[in-house]
Amino acid sequence: MISLLLLLVLAWGFYIGYRRGLLLQVYYLISAMTSAFMAGQFYKGLGEQFHLLLPYANPQEGQGTFFFPSDQLFQLDKVFYAGIGYLLVFGIVYSIGRLLGLLLHLLPSKKLGGKLFQVSAGILSMLVTLFVLQMALTILATIPMAAIQNPLEKSIVAKHIIQSIPVTTSWLKQIWVTNLIG
């Protein structure tokens, strides 16, 4: 069920980009990349502030995660809070970029026609959607609760989004896991 929902969200992302056109979608991709860079600058300090605001489920005896090694189990709260901080900064900066994109969309411009441009725009939009889904699913994967871990582990699409996206998987693990807990 989760796999179907994730595939529908990705298909919706493709459709939205297909309808927008390539120029606007390139702008949104640049906005997402800028948001990711900005979030990478501020997420640590912000993540530390969430310890008092958001509860984190402590691991129970015999409970673990499918996506992280067991020796990191008692340090995953740092990854969880850093991920929340990163996602928050990313969301704020990207929302500003989207607002500016709406204004950009109102300017008269020549729309690049043709299926190739539309399909390219759809793929770019799907990549941005995939990155946002990957951030959210990776944050969920840090929570050591069976009610969260089991559905994620059983979903083929969720597992691949968390573990197998070529560039962003290693990058997110580098900034969220390796930089924080080693």
Predicted regions located by residue number:
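Alpha-helical transmembrane segments and their juxtamembrane interface "caps"
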Residues: 1-182
